[in-house]
């Protein structure tokens, strides 16, 4: 089981049926296939349990996990530039004239196509968790762009996917700033030793504090000067540590050893049993964390 490292959280904006059996058929039409000789990138679904199962969905207690794989061809720009310059030089010498910009652009496409079959590939996988009980979708990635790309694949697979980023009633940075200013985060949370503060004005500067007590005169001065806390490291019930960001993303999730070792009694040979147990454990903990976090941040924005 791959324990999530980050969370981009989305709210299903209207009621939609997400049944694993039906989804399995819909996702099958978009199973991952490797890049062909002229493909720059390919994305598709793979089994979240890897070699242990061919199923593209894994479901327990209303929680569904999916896995998207992306292959990208790597063409270093210096290699492309060198090949293009050589081709331009050769043609200009043969024709005795300078090539036009449109001709050079056309040549660049030719060069790219000629290099693609020899290009190396970079692969990455993105896990997605659908909480059908709470109507939420979580993507395990650190950027909104990557999350949106994964959601776009799911939307294409299902035909429609009405989701919006989970947003709070109050600006998150104002709540985080108050937690640091007062030294009193919401119940169940504890300030750790890392934060980022930004001035309201773009050219007002950024302060990054690491391994530092945040409830101190130095940080207080920055807050009094108008800086807002945009990232804050927190501990939740001594079970999960993470960084809360002002855009609503939850980064650098770290589960305590007690949690991660909770299913150690399951035999190593029982890979699917361990995956299932860890999935139930992780989603249960994260669902509770998200619920507490939303409450602590002042509640979800009214839709």
Swiss-Prot record:
Cellular component terms (Gene Ontology): bacterial nucleoid; cytoplasm
Any one of the GO BP annotations: DNA recombination
Domain of life (superkingdom): Bacteria
Major subcellular location class: cytoplasm
Subcellular location per the Swiss-Prot or TrEMBL entry: Cytoplasm, Nucleoid
Keywords: Cytoplasm, DNA recombination
Single GO molecular function: double-stranded DNA binding
Family from the record: Belongs to the RdgC family.
PANTHER family to which the protein is assigned, alphabetical: RECOMBINATION-ASSOCIATED PROTEIN RDGC
Function recorded in the entry: May be involved in recombination.
The protein's name: Recombination-associated protein RdgC
Organism: Enterobacter sp. (strain 638)
The organism's taxonomic lineage, starting at the top: Bacteria, Pseudomonadati, Pseudomonadota, Gammaproteobacteria, Enterobacterales
Gene name per UniProt: rdgC
């Amino acid at each position: 089981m791959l324990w999530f490292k980050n969370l981009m959280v989305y709210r299903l904006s209207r009621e939609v049926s997400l049944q694993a059996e039906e989804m399995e058929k819909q996702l099958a039409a978009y199973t991952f296939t490797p890049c062909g000789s002229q493909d720059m990138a390919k994305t598709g679904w793979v089994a979240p349990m890897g070699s242990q199962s061919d199923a593209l969905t894994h479901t327990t207690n209303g929680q569904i996990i999916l896995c998207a794989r992306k292959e990208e061809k790597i063409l270093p720009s210096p290699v492309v530039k060198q090949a293009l310059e050589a081709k331009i030089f050769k043609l200009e010498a043969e024709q005795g004239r300078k090539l036009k910009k449109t001709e050079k652009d056309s040549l660049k496409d030719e060069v790219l196509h000629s290099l693609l079959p020899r290009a190396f590939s970079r692969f990455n996988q993105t896990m997605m968790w659908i909480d059908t009980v709470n109507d939420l979708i979580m993507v395990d990635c650190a950027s909104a762009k990557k999350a949106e790309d994964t959601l776009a694949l799911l939307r294409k697979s299902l035909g429609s996917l009405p989701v919006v980023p989970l947003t709070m009633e109050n600006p998150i940075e104002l709540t985080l700033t108050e937690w640091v200013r007062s030294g009193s985060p919401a119940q169940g949370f504890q300030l750790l030793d890392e934060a980022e503060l930004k001035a309201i004005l773009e050219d007002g500067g950024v302060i990054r504090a690491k391994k530092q007590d945040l409830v101190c005169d130095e940080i207080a001065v920055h807050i009094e000067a108008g800086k807002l806390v945009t990232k804050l490291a927190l501990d939740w019930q001594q079970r999960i540590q993470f960084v809360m960001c002002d855009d609503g993303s939850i980064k650098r999730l770290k589960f305590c050893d007690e949690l991660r070792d909770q299913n150690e009694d399951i035999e190593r040979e029982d890979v699917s049993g361990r995956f299932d147990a860890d999935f139930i454990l992780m989603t249960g903990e994260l669902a509770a964390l998200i619920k507490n976090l939303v409450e602590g941040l002042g509640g979800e924005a009214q839709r």
